[in-house]
Amino acid sequence: MSSPNNQPLSCSLRQLSISPTAPPGDVGTPGSLLSLSSSSSSNTDSSGSSLGSLSLNSNSSGSDNDSKVSSPSREIPSDPPLPRAVPTVRLGRSTSSRSRNSLNLDMKDPSEKPRRSLPTAAGQNNIGSPPTPPGPFPGGLSTDIQEKLKAFHASRSKSMPEVVNKISSPTTPIVGMGQRGSYPLPNSQLAGRLSNSPVKSPNMPESGLAKSLAAARNPLLNRPTSFNRQTRIRRAPPGKLDLSNSNPTSPVSPSSMASRRGLNIPPTLKQAVSETPFSTFSDILDAKSGTLNFKNKAVLNSEGVNFSSGSSFRINMSEIIKLEELGKGNYGVVYKALHQPTGVTMALKEIRLSLEEATFNQIIMELDILHKAVSPYIVDFYGAFFVEGSVFICMEYMDAGSMDKLYAGGIKDEGVLARTAYAVVQGLKTLKEEHNIIHRDVKPTNVLVNSNGQVKLCDFGVSGNLVASISKTNIGCQSYMAPERIRVGGPTNGVLTYTVQADVWSLGLTILEMALGAYPYPPESYTSIFAQLSAICDGDPPSLPDSFSPEARDFVNKCLNKNPSLRPDYHELANHPWLLKYQNADVDMASWAKGALKEKGEKRS
């Protein structure tokens, strides 16, 4: 391989430079001379070619003396020239040279490779950072034109809002708005641009750019403000939540997440977030202290109950031992229990709290009635307490149970029926005359008997069957409601749909069921529950068989009169001839109760 002047050609890979005497675009063009000179014979291979040094000269003279060029300098000039495109130089080799040692620059030491040199900002280390972007005026513009453009750019910068001036400079384009090929910013500059407190110019209105930047930093600014109140209400979450501007914002705790983000949360929003199902009953239920506070009524805790009347009952779960389950009602379970300090056997009724207003109303109603209504015809009240989400009511234990467990085959003894009817009438009379209370749930399961022959009322329209047997709880079609309660509508013949007379109807059905030993409207006699209710409302009322005395039949017939205004009240019933007849008669209620218990036990065995 030789030069045009037939001079030996040698290559040096340690020195490579391009002479600046001609423009970069002239390299390799016709008229330019590529000369290679040998500087050492020690690197000559067997074919005589030298790979010692390589130099490129763009002089058109072709002199061998011009082939020596100094190595490229690594120093950064104080005023670097504008970057220009560096041409790619391809060295052609003959077939013979390619068959020998290949000229591979990648096999050399990295420090010996030629590098592209770019201007670096003063005082900035570009190691490990992206390349510095070119200036805002690329191209081969003359110095005076560049100065004019810089002055124009500076004048425009002064007139722009300060928020834009803070994030722009003559050498750094704005992110998202600069020229193509803009480079990432250093972390310090990026942090400054993403400040949460954009600065507004005091003299100039906020520009669209500043608004868009502020909206991007704070998403709350993106909310529309032009919709009316009705639109705002429709978009608001359900519940008592008003996000109108009239609502004042409450201060936020400095340590809260909202405070660190610079947000003010309306108090209604805080209430909606923190609200739980128990919040609705926060005026009654205090979960921290474990207290139920029925205002102006009673306060329950784990140690007992205090009534507003001044009565207090101290009792707790640690003093009670559950013996057996007696039955289940609509809202709880009844246990036979032993009070250890006194040795008294009692009925313990557990009512599990549910987040319904009706449950709380029923609990306080029963507690209020039990502790006020002191009567030999109403079960005694021993106390109550609240623990582990349940209300426990302690009351008198009636060992013979409810009447529905004792009338098997029907009660043929009119004396037992009359004494039972008298006790129920006296209990209902006490509730109405002394406490203005209507029982609303008179039926055999709520009439209790003990082995001494005493008959007492329980379950005052609160929890359904107090000691209903488990087998009886499945009978949901039996209704003791008066026809006026079943009918849909308002008053009937000028009389309200529910009065004392409704309990009188229920009393008549109860006495009739005890005498017959079965419910007077047997479900198996009707095709559906609707047919059964229709018979109660529109059919002839049932009555006692002719085998019973006329007084007994008259008593039941008056109670079951379809016209509530023609039914007797409690005073008339208490003085009915049938009841008066057996008031002074010798009726052994204790023997009957014991015999019924014995018969029930034999049936169980």
From Swiss-Prot:
The gene is wis1. This is Protein kinase wis1. Residues 320-579 form the Protein kinase domain. Residues 106-115 have a biased composition (Basic and acidic residues). Residues 31-73, 90-105, 244-256 have a biased composition (Low complexity). The modification Phosphothreonine is found at T473. Keywords: ATP-binding, Cell cycle, Cell division, Kinase, Mitosis, Nucleotide-binding, Phosphoprotein, Serine/threonine-protein kinase, Transferase. One of its GO terms (molecular function) is protein tyrosine kinase activity. GO terms for cellular component: cytoplasm; cytosol; Mcs4 RR-MAPKKK complex; nucleus. One of its GO terms (biological process) is cell division. It holds the Pfam family Pkinase. SMART domains: S_TKc. The modification Phosphoserine is found at S168, S253, S469. Dephosphorylated by pyp1 and pyp2.
